[in-house]
A protein has these predicted regions:
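Conserved alpha/beta enzyme-core scaffolds, especially Rossmann-like or related mixed alpha/beta domains
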Residues: 1-53, 174-176, 213-216
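Non-catalytic terminal extensions that flank enzyme cores
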Residues: 2-3, 8, 82, 94-97, ...
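Short secondary-structure transition/capping segments
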Residues: 21-22, 56-58, 221
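Catalytic cores of large soluble enzymes that bind and process phosphate-bearing ligands
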Residues: 21-25, 152, 202, 206
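Charged, often glycine-rich, active-site loop that binds/positions anionic groups
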Residues: 25-29, 60, 191
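A short, terminal or domain-edge coil/loop segment
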Residues: 33-44, 98-109, 224-230
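Active-site cores that bind ATP or allylic diphosphates and position pyrophosphate for catalysis
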Residues: 44, 49-189, 196-201
Length: 230
């Protein structure tokens, strides 16, 4: 709210598409999991990260540096339980299929399943929906018409489009923005102790400056913009 941004619905107000906290939306995610499981679009995948690192058939790496899950770990048969339990579940991608969409900023985007990304997790070991499934379910049930996010999630969009298709849902439009970088050319992220809104406020940066810089990054297509040193 300090930035002057307001929203029509959310956890701190009324709305027609709640609940708005993912911790309160477990039933929505479970229904989607059950549908995918019955269709055999997903399978249990108990392998740990260490298993993948030490496997004789190590995962290959895509052009974007993403590890592609080895097809050798796909089970031939499995019983569909009533609940996912405490084991990861992966979506089986259609190998060789080109997933394409027209991004409102970058234009035509294409990814090849099985090459640019592999079978991906939709249900986590701690018995919670993984990011890819949760955002698809939320956006569909909340009737989101346009998703705006960073261009580092372009491949995630391809994965999510496969989920929309498998669930028989219409997907929203997508607008992927350029990334905001610091003065060293690094993306602003929690994991790298990137600059936060709280820190900008402490330094006396005005809401107007933050908004203007963000808008400038959206306007410039196909080029990253660095945070000004002023």
């Amino acid at each position: 709210r300090w930035l002057g941004l307001s929203w029509t619905e959310g956890p701190d107000g009324e709305g027609d598409h709640g609940p708005y906290l993912q911790s309160q939306r477990s039933d929505f995610y479970l229904q989607a999991w059950q549908r995918l499981a019955q269709q055999k679009d997903i399978y249990p995948s108990p392998q740990s990260r260490r298993d993948l690192e030490t496997a004789a058939f190590a995962p290959h790496v895509s052009d974007e540096g993403e590890s592609v899950f080895p097809k050798n770990y796909r089970p031939n048969e499995w019983v569909v339980p009533e609940h996912p339990g405490r084991v990861p579940w992966r979506f089986r991608v259609p190998d060789g299929k080109t997933i394409q969409f027209v991004d409102k900023n970058f234009g035509l985007v294409q990814r090849v399943a099985g090459t640019d990304f592999g079978d991906f997790v939709v249900w986590r070991r701690d018995n919670l929906a993984a990011y890819e499934l949760a955002v698809v379910v939320d956006d569909y049930h909340m009737e989101i018409g346009e998703v705006v996010r960073g261009k580092d999630l372009l491949t995630s969009t391809a994965r999510q489009l496969l989920l929309y298709e498998a669930l028989g849902w219409k997907s929203p439009d997508f607008f992927h923005t350029n990334l905001v970088l610091d003065c060293n050319g690094e993306r602003l992220a929690k994991r790298s102790n990137g600059m936060t809104i709280r820190e900008l406020r402490r330094q006396g940066v005005t809401p107007e400056k933050v908004r203007n810089h963000s808008l400038e990054g959206i306007r410039i297509s196909r080029h990253d913009s660095s945070w000004p040193n002023k």
